[in-house]
């Protein structure tokens, strides 16, 4: 007598994590409800990043989001900076949401979409009439032939598979099964582009006077891998900045004439920019976003022309005014203040007691404290927002793939089987979408088949 002592072999310990991932984690990761929840959360924080100004100074948030009263009862500058809502698209938790969403889509593609495509490509002939009973749409005809049906289906762009004269399988719209996979690829590409842009892009701001040359230095927000995007071997010169005003004195548009210079100071690009018409060079985009007054050019008596810097004054929200002070005596014991609110050339002159002495325009002179003061020009400065986002081409590519996948998904994957048994013709079909349209198409095919059979019978008789 022999005894069977065989027992189930225990799985090695290193295979346990893989089994756990497949049985417990993977079903959760591929759950449609998780993908929808992640998409809604990402959309919510994306909206917050649009509503809440990004990349501003702490003073800006303290002024616009005070603790008392808090916006919506909870949104203060402290909350914004602690959570990272001032640079939401670069926070670790937002990037983690993108990675998790992309991982969910990728897992869904491999565990559901690709198997569904493989299943759609695997088919078999129906060789028994009872097989047609499980189809949602089927018919039994006492006239017609498989060959006649084959010709009708070919005219309707079906791909025909036929090994015997009495058996047929036809399909069209297999591209509709590929469409969801392409959609997932497009979305994942968009997510990768967004992550790459957040990691390698930067935002800078510069206020540059007319005639000045600058390099991008004032970085206000940058990804951890953005150092390689900072311009090193070229600079930008603001040739001229000016503002067009409406007849009523309001600002119509402001312009900057800009040149890109290489290391030798040679102009390699040139463009006049204004709002919504930026300058782009080597992946860096310069937007016209603001303006200011950087200085005023004056002359006292017959002295050389000199330029005084003008500073933005605190007006408690009553508009923007720039001012400077100019001495009228060598020992600096007396002087006057010059104020300007725009680039139309109007300058207000105040004495030490704050009394308005005179109002002059650019090119005019006036007598103050016994000297002749001539205002030659008010020098403007252009406010530029500078961005670099290497992920944008990837995002655009992803959107192109996404739109292609959406179009492909509109095609219905329709399948038709046919079997000739004696004088009986069995026809059945199914589709994955647009069921009503498919039923109408099958009815038209059967009517066409019946009319051909009737015509053939009349000709024989």
Swiss-Prot record:
UniProt-listed GO biological process terms: cytochrome complex assembly
Protein name: Cytochrome c biogenesis protein CcsB
Thylakoid is among the record's keywords: yes
Entry similarity comment: Belongs to the Ccs1/CcsB family.
Segments traversing the membrane: 32-52, 91-111, 178-198
The species this protein was found in: Trichormus variabilis (strain ATCC 29413 / PCC 7937)
Biological role stated in the UniProt entry: Required during biogenesis of c-type cytochromes (cytochrome c6 and cytochrome f) at the step of heme attachment.
Pfam family, one: ResB
Keyword Thylakoid assigned: yes
Signal peptide stretch: none
Lipid bilayer topology: Multi-pass membrane protein
Localization per Swiss-Prot or TrEMBL: Cellular thylakoid membrane
Keyword set, alphabetical order: Cytochrome c-type biogenesis, Membrane, Thylakoid, Transmembrane, Transmembrane helix
Source species, domain of life: Bacteria
HAMAP family named among the record's database cross-references: CytC_Ccs1
GO CC list: plasma membrane-derived thylakoid membrane
Subunit-level organization: May interact with CcsA.
């Amino acid at each position: 007598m022999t005894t069977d002592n065989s027992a189930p072999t225990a799985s090695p310990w290193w295979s346990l994590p893989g089994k756990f991932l497949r049985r417990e984690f993977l079903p959760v990761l591929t759950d449609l409800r998780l993908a929808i929840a992640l998409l809604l959360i990402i959309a919510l924080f994306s909206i917050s990043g649009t509503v809440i100004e990004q990349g501003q100074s702490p003073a800006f948030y303290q002024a616009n989001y005070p603790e008392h009263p808090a916006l919506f009862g909870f949104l203060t500058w402290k909350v914004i900076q602690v959570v990272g809502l001032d640079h939401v698209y670069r926070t670790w938790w937002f990037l983690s949401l993108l990675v998790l969403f992309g991982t969910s889509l990728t897992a869904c593609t491999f565990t559901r979409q690709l198997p569904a495509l493989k299943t759609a490509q695997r088919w078999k002939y129906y060789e028994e009439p009872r097989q047609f009973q499980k189809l949602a749409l089927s018919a039994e005809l006492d006239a017609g032939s498989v060959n006649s049906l084959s010709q009708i289906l070919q005219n309707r762009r079906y791909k025909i598979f036929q090994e015997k004269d009495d058996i047929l399988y036809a399909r069209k719209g297999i591209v509709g099964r590929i469409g969801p996979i392409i959609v997932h690829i497009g979305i994942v590409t968009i997510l990768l582009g967004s992550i790459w842009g957040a990691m390698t892009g930067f935002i800078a701001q510069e206020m540059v006077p007319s005639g000045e040359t600058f390099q991008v230095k004032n970085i206000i927000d940058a990804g951890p891998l953005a150092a390689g995007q900072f311009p090193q071997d070229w600079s930008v010169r603001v040739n001229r900045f000016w503002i067009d005003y409406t007849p009523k004195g309001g600002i119509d548009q402001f312009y900057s004439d800009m040149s890109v210079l290489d290391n030798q100071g040679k102009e390699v690009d040139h463009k006049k920019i204004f709002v919504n018409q930026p300058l782009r060079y080597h992946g860096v985009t310069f937007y016209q976003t603001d303006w200011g007054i950087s200085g005023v050019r004056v002359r006292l008596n017959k002295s050389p022309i000199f330029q005084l810097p003008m500073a933005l004054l605190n007006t408690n929200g009553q508009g923007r005014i720039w001012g400077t002070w100019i001495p009228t005596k060598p020992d600096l014991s007396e002087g006057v203040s010059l104020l300007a609110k725009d680039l139309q050339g109007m300058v207000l002159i105040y004495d030490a007691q704050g009394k308005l002495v005179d109002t002059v325009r650019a090119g005019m002179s006036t007598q103050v404290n016994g000297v002749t003061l001539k205002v030659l020009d008010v020098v403007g400065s252009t406010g530029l927002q500078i961005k670099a986002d290497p992920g944008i081409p990837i995002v655009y590519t992803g959107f192109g793939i996404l739109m292609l996948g959406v179009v492909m998904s509109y095609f219905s994957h329709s399948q038709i089987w046919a079997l000739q048994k004696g004088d009986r013709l069995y026809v059945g079909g199914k589709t994955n979408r647009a069921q009503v349209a498919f039923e109408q198409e099958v009815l038209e095919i059967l009517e066409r088949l019946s009319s051909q059979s009737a015509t053939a019978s009349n000709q024989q008789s």
